């Protein structure tokens, strides 16, 4: 079976590499699926993130038509505060708005991971509770000026500079980064990929 990561995210690539535990035989390729990420009317956050992960995996599978036995991994991460999905910021002002909203509060990070093969698609959802410390305007301005939050759900990266805002987490750290390792390993193992 040929493993394919349906993502160009460097964070997901690095995390998936960890699953191989350094074994030379654990290899994968990457494709860049293009899907519409617009939430459907009335769609709950957990349904939305699972749908996107599955759609990314299936779109990736469609890009692998010439490959022998592809198994395509798709993933999506969202940040949810008070039942509102906080996606990637559209600009610096939006990033600042989101960071102000997260300041001093707990929010949920949801990451869904899907594995699509010719005959089936399996999805896992992982939720992690993240609590932010209180952020000053100077903290927010400096962080946004670093440009780190501009391509991240919820306008922060726990694995980078944004990690200094995280007071605590309850759940999977790798979920917050963008690919829950335990659940991804389970999906791969169930598919016979080790």
Curated annotation (Swiss-Prot):
- The answer to whether keyword Cytoplasm applies is yes
The first-level EC class reads hydrolase
Q: What keywords are assigned to this protein?
A: Cytoplasm, Hydrolase, Nucleotide metabolism
Annotated Gene Ontology cellular components are: cytoplasm
Compartments reported by the entry: Cytoplasm
| Requisite cofactors | a divalent metal cation
NCBIfam families linked to this entry: maf (TIGR00172)
Q: Family assignment?
A: Belongs to the Maf family. YhdE subfamily.
Q: What is this protein called?
A: dTTP/UTP pyrophosphatase
Q: Which organism is it from?
A: Shewanella sp. (strain MR-4)
